[in-house]
């Protein structure tokens, strides 16, 4: 059944999948349902799910309490384009949970969150360049997709196209403090450094001892905002994410679908001192 569905999909969906990471030979397994830690494929095989939405489905598939809440909300409507009490409650909860968080902007996707976090940093600092680490994945938009550790975007012509769009993106090796120190000597117009506290898209690469502390110190000394991309690490390393686990206080943090156990939900969090930029940029 999965093989047949893949052949049908290739006729209408580029590559037969809606994300390059879902494509593998000879064909991907198509899923019909999931419950708890297991999924059932369209081939009627029950499998233990080690992926769990790339970590977003923290509580398991079809978690009863969340499903019940969703069903209740569906009867009340789904899109108002107006504020709700629930978003205020979520912002308040995140401010209590995430270190160094005084303001929160709620969104729907991880890419949207990191994009707005970078825009916030550029607005607040009035600088235009960003620093990311080789292999770090921060979303599917051009500014950060270069050297993202995904095979689908690592070869020409995609890299050639991204190069022009990402000309203000500076890429250095992860865990390489010397490279960062040399970079800030050369470039005085760096708005922010964005980092996955634990590099996930090219394998789980743990930061060397004192690495995160040092990049916090270097960014502070050079007027560069530090962004923790916690799309993967948020609520997993600890309830307060990598920021709490490592004891580092970034200026801005981003969180993804783990906020909603896999539902489209994301957030940007940070300090209240950037309030004017919060309002004008995101």
Could you tell me what each predicted segment is?
Residues 1-282:
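Conserved N-terminal phosphate-binding loop of PLP-dependent enzymes in the Aspartate aminotransferase
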């Amino acid at each position: 059944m999965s093989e047949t569905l893949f052949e049908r999909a290739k006729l209408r969906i580029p590559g037969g999948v809606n994300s390059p990471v879902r494509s593998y030979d000879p064909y991907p397994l198509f899923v019909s349902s999931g419950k708890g830690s297991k999924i059932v494929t369209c081939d009627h095989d029950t499998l233990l799910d080690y992926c769990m939405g790339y970590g977003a489905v923290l509580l398991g598939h079809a978690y009863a309490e969340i499903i019940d809440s969703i069903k209740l909300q569906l009867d009340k409507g789904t899109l108002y384009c107006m504020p709700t009490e629930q978003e205020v409650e979520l912002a308040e909860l995140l401010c209590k949970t995430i270190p160094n968080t005084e303001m929160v902007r709620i969104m729907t996707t991880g890419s949207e969150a990191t994009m707005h976090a970078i825009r916030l940093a550029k607005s607040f600092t009035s600088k235009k360049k960003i620093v990311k680490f080789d292999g770090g994945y921060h979303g599917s938009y051009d500014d950060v997709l270069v050297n993202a550790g995904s095979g689908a975007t690592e070869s020409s012509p995609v890299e050639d196209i991204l190069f022009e769009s990402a000309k203000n993106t500076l890429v250095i090796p992860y865990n390489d403090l010397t490279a960062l120190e040399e970079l800030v000597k050369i470039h005085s117009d760096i708005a922010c450094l964005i980092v996955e506290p634990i590099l996930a898209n090219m394998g789980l690469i743990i930061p060397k001892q004192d690495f995160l502390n040092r990049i916090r110190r270097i960014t502070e000394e050079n007027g560069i905002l530090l962004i923790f991309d916690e799309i993967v690490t948020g609520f997993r390393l600890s309830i307060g994410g990598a920021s709490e686990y490592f004891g580092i206080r970034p200026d801005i943090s981003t969180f993804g679908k783990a906020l909603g156990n896999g539902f489209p939900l994301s957030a940007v969090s940070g300090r209240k001192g950037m309030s004017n930029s919060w309002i004008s940029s995101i």
